From Swiss-Prot:
One of its GO terms (molecular function) is magnesium ion binding. It is found in: Cytoplasm. Pathway: Cofactor biosynthesis; (R)-pantothenate biosynthesis; (R)-pantoate from 3-methyl-2-oxobutanoate: step 1/2. It comes from Picosynechococcus sp. (strain ATCC 27264 / PCC 7002 / PR-6). InterPro entries: Pantoate_hydroxy_MeTrfase, Pyrv/PenolPyrv_kinase-like_dom, Pyrv_kinase-like_dom_sf. This is 3-methyl-2-oxobutanoate hydroxymethyltransferase.
Length: 262
């Protein structure tokens, strides 16, 4: 049965942890979906993972649509959420509506995700949800703000913690169906999780969130530089390199293709 935003909200009520991973193409999406995750996020992290950029900022709306289309073709059960890329929704409400509309109309994603919970962003979320667009929020460390906030942990001071709490609450009140809490203290994440009636999805935010998300490339060992809070379950980087080296050796020593006789 297909996971929906309502499914995730029911999971919070029953204390069932929500499993989320990213995907950027058909092959990864198909495998992640087969493994039984609840949510597949087509994150703008594909800018680094799939396109080789240093951060998420350069990825375009066209690229996000292209990759989301590929991911959706590989998914049968998980909820697919697509990130809105940098400066494709922050300028105005009309821009946000246009961007979200393109993603939902040109792909088969079921929801979008955007960053920030300040008053203008909460207004954007409220407008989108009123138009029928399911929105996942994102507070704490917001990678699209790398040039102003950096990649440091957020919420360490009382002022910062209050801001993150207020933003999460504002997103819920605006109609978001879930919110990502990134790289904040575990105690702060627990406080937010207890205050909200919508699910919290943590990444580098401790174990007291309603669910967890990782960048799949970090999990598989494909990232050149994974964040300190990521856990690597497989060293696919070395496995792929070794397989390619073995193939190269076989070709150069004429062991491949095998001799099939005359």
């Amino acid at each position: 049965m297909r996971v929906t935003p309502r499914t995730l909200q029911n999971y919070k009520k029953t204390a069932r942890p929500i499993v989320t991973l990213t995907a950027w193409d058909y092959a990864i999406a198909r495998l992640v979906d087969q493994a039984g995750v609840d949510v597949i996020l087509v994150g703008d992290s594909l800018a680094m993972v799939a396109l080789g950029y240093e951060n998420t900022l350069p990825v375009t709306l066209e690229a996000m649509i292209h990759h989301t289309q590929a991911v959706c073709r590989g998914v049968k059960n998980a909820l697919v959420v697509s990130d809105l890329p940098f400066l494709t929704y922050q300028e105005s409400l009309s821009q946000a509506i246009h961007t979200a509309g393109r993603i939902l109309k040109e792909t088969t994603a079921q929801a979008i995700k955007l960053e920030g919970g300040h008053p203008a962003m909460a207004e954007t979320v409220e407008r989108l949800t009123r138009l029928g667009v399911p929105v996942m929020g994102h507070v704490g460390l917001t990678p699209q703000s790398v040039h102003t906030l950096g990649y440091r942990q957020q919420g360490n001071t009382e002022l910062e913690a209050t801001r993150v709490i207020q933003e999460a609450i504002a997103l819920e009140q605006a109609g978001a169906f879930a919110v990502v809490l990134e790289h904040i203290p575990a105690t702060l994440a627990q406080t937010i999780t207890e205050k909200l009636t919508i699910p919290t999805i943590g990444i580098g935010a401790g174990r007291h969130c309603d669910g967890q998300v990782l960048v799949t490339a970090d999990l598989l060992g494909l990232s050149e530089k994974a964040p300190p809070f990521a856990k690597q379950y497989l060293d696919l980087d070395n496995l792929i390199t070794n397989a390619v080296q073995r193939y190269s050796d076989d070709v150069r020593t004429q062991q491949f293709p095998p001799h099939l006789g005359s």
